[in-house]
Amino acid sequence: MQVYLVGGAVRDHLLGIDIYDRDWVVVGATPEIMLSQGYTAVGKDFPVFLHPKTKEEHALARTERKSGAGYTGFECFFDQSVTLEEDLIRRDLTINAMAMDEDGNLYDPYGGQKDIDAKVLRHVSQAFVEDPLRVLRVARFAAKLAHLGFSVAEETMQLMRDMAESGELSTLTPERVWQEWHKSLSTSRPDVFLSVLRDCGALAVVLPEIDALFGVPQPEKWHPEIDTGIHTLMVAQQAAKLSDSLPVRFAAQVHDLGKGVTPESEWPSHKMHCHTGLKLIKKLCDRVRVPNEFRDLALMVCEQHSNIHRAAELKPQTIIKILNKFDVWRKAERLQDILICCQADHAGRKGLEDQPYPQAELFMRAYQAAASVDVQAIIKDGFKGPAIRDEQEKRRAEAVKVALGK
């Protein structure tokens, strides 16, 4: 029996980046042999075992045969005769189809190291087209490795286009779409995930609300990039620069969905997009099972980002109403997240990426002034029942007025 480190750990070792998970393949073993050596069986569909000491996953070498539609339609075959090369060829990309033995020797039958040197994401074999999830995985790897200069090989992109056109992507469950989208949000370039899916035609299938933004014009005076889809990619990139928060990055990507349903007769104006976008965000989040933490922030950013952009024009009472909607008195950190999204929106415009965004500081100053109002002082002054809340609102608005010099 021979044990090999495989997949992402080998790739990341060669790239010189941090390794978080290590997966192993075992050649020449059986389930009985693994159990006799103290491994614990955990795999349901195929034999995966946990190492008795490290608890890292060790899978028996296996082959796969397409037996039905979608990414679950596979039959697995494993026994002692399956070779390392046979196991590696079923993997998605050449850079993920390398192995290393316990002495550090590299096994690279499909040219993964060469593609790492060339910074190319290339499929291992034609079997790539059998698993629609691979389209999303390639887009995610493109986002993960974009900062190193990686791009998708043209022949791989063509296979992805063919898969998008075939209808096979419709077999992906909402949970798997969200799983890959969610993982892409933690990369250095989440926008690349969306742009690769757009380039191969998959975005229209899995995230049609975002795809609908491409080709929709905005006023050139405010948006030199004009195209709402391009703007969305730019905002996604800016949000990733400004924050590591995944809900912030998600909210930035969907904040303008309403522009995708503006009637053409109203273009390039989108006066109702902060309102129309709310329904689209709810529908999208329900469909791909987005967690409430992400959904709630996205809805608040969508509804209020235009108001925050014109913070200097708002009356103190209006600012208090907005802060109340955000529930900042109980969730103070939420305001910072919303302001970062708005700043990303402001910076996600061609040639205006470095323009200051004083609105964020203004809104934060207003919040701090309003938060300083002491409810106990209001009670001491003799206010009771609902009158306490009314007086609190008045004093908060007055505090904002003083702080902002209005």
From Swiss-Prot:
Annotated family: Belongs to the tRNA nucleotidyltransferase/poly(A) polymerase family. Bacterial CCA-adding enzyme type 1 subfamily.
Subunit structure: Monomer. Can also form homodimers and oligomers.
UniProt xrefs under InterPro entries: CCA_bact, HD/PDEase_dom, HD_domain, NT_sf, PolA_pol_head_dom, PolyA_RNA-bd, tRNA_CCA-adding_enzyme
Other observations noted: A single active site specifically recognizes both ATP and CTP and is responsible for their addition.
Keyword tRNA processing: yes
Binding positions for CTP per the UniProt entry: G8, R11, R91, R137, R140
Binding site for ATP: G8, R11, R91, R137, R140
Binding site for Mg(2+): D21, D23
Pfam families (alphabetical): HD (PF01966), PolyA_pol (PF01743), PolyA_pol_RNAbd (PF12627)
Protein known as: Multifunctional CCA protein
Enzyme Commission code(s) on record: 2.7.7.72, 3.1.3.-, 3.1.4.-
Record-level GO BP terms: RNA repair; tRNA 3'-terminal CCA addition
Protein function: Catalyzes the addition and repair of the essential 3'-terminal CCA sequence in tRNAs without using a nucleic acid template. Adds these three nucleotides in the order of C, C, and A to the tRNA nucleotide-73, using CTP and ATP as substrates and producing inorganic pyrophosphate. tRNA 3'-terminal CCA addition is required both for tRNA processing and repair. Also involved in tRNA surveillance by mediating tandem CCA addition to generate a CCACCA at the 3' terminus of unstable tRNAs. While stable tRNAs receive only 3'-terminal CCA, unstable tRNAs are marked with CCACCA and rapidly degraded.
Note on cofactor: Magnesium is required for nucleotidyltransferase activity. Nickel for phosphatase activity.
Superkingdom classification of source: Bacteria
Gene that specifies this protein: cca
Domain remarks in the Swiss-Prot or TrEMBL record: Comprises two domains: an N-terminal domain containing the nucleotidyltransferase activity and a C-terminal HD domain associated with both phosphodiesterase and phosphatase activities.
Entry keyword Transport: no
Catalysis performed (reactions): a tRNA precursor + 2 CTP + ATP = a tRNA with a 3' CCA end + 3 diphosphate; a tRNA with a 3' CCA end + 2 CTP + ATP = a tRNA with a 3' CCACCA end + 3 diphosphate
Cofactor: Mg(2+); Ni(2+)
Boundaries of every HD domain copy: 228-329
Keyword tags: ATP-binding, Hydrolase, Magnesium, Metal-binding, Multifunctional enzyme, Nickel, Nucleotide-binding, Nucleotidyltransferase, RNA repair, RNA-binding, Transferase, tRNA processing
GO molecular function per UniProt: ATP binding; CCA tRNA nucleotidyltransferase activity; cyclic-nucleotide phosphodiesterase activity; magnesium ion binding; phosphatase activity; tRNA binding
